[in-house]
C-alpha cells in the first residue's frame, strides 16, 4: 500500500466506518495516517440526508443543540413554504396573502438564526453564507412552483425580510 499515505473520512455510516477501520488498521504501523470520525447511525442518516445544515453537527464552534435547531428551522421553513404553494393548487389564490405568508416564513427563519446567534455568536462567515444559500434555494423552489401556478412574486419581495432582519 505504498501509494496511500492518508485516509480521512468523516460523517459516514457507522458500519462503513467500522469496516474501513478494521481493513486499514494494520496499515497505520506502515505509515498510513488514518482518521475516521463522526460515524453515523442509520437513524441520523435518515433524519439528516436532506438537511443542508447536517455539516453543522460536529463543527468545532457549533453545539449539537444549535445544529439540531438549524435542522428544525429548515424543516419548519419547508413545511411553511409547502403550505403556501399548496394554496395555489385549487386555482385562484390571494396573491397578497401568499406574499404575506412567505414574508412571515422568511421572518421566522431569520429570527430563529438571530436568536441562536445572540446567545453564543457562533455564526461566522461560512454559516452566514450557508444560511443565506439554504433560504435562497428554498425561495427559488417556491418561486418556480408558484410561477407554474400562475403566481409571480418578485425576488426582492422574498428576500427583503431576510436582509432587513438579519443580525448575524
Residue ranges of predicted features:
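Short terminal alpha-helical segments
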Residues: 31-90, 165
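Short, solvent-exposed, charged loop/turn and helix-capping segments
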Residues: 86-104, 112-131
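Short, surface-exposed amphipathic charged segments that create phosphate/polyanion-binding patches used
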Residues: 22-24, 48
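Alpha-helical repeat scaffolds in large eukaryotic proteins
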Residues: 75-89, 107-118, 136-143
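Residue-level detector of well-ordered alpha-helical segments, enriched
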Residues: 69, 73, 101-108, 131-134
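Amphipathic alpha-helical binding modules
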Residues: 28, 33-42, 121-168
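Concave beta-strand-loop units of leucine-rich repeat
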Residues: 1-18, 26-38
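Generic alpha-helical secondary structure signal
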Residues: 15-18, 22, 100, 129, ...
Amino acid at each position: 500500500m505504498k501509494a496511500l499515505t492518508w485516509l480521512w473520512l468523516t460523517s459516514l455510516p457507522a458500519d462503513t466506518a467500522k469496516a474501513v477501520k478494521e481493513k486499514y488498521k494494520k496499515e497505520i504501523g506502515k505509515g498510513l495516517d488514518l482518521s475516521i470520525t463522526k460515524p453515523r447511525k442509520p437513524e441520523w442518516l435518515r433524519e439528516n440526508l436532506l438537511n443542508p445544515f447536517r455539516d453543522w453537527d460536529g463543527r468545532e464552534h457549533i453545539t449539537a443543540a444549535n445544529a439540531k435547531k438549524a435542522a428544525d428551522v429548515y424543516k419548519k421553513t419547508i413545511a411553511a413554504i409547502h403550505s403556501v404553494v399548496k394554496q395555489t393548487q385549487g386555482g385562484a389564490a390571494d396573491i397578497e396573502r401568499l406574499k404575506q405568508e412567505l414574508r412571515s416564513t422568511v421572518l421566522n427563519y431569520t429570527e430563529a438564526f438571530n436568536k441562536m446567534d445572540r446567545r453564543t455568536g457562533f455564526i461566522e462567515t461560512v454559516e452566514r453564507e450557508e444560511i443565506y444559500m439554504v433560504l435562497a434555494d428554498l425561495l427559488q423552489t417556491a418561486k418556480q412552483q408558484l410561477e407554474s401556478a400562475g403566481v409571480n412574486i418578485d425576488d426582492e419581495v422574498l428576500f427583503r425580510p431576510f436582509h432587513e432582519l438579519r443580525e448575524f
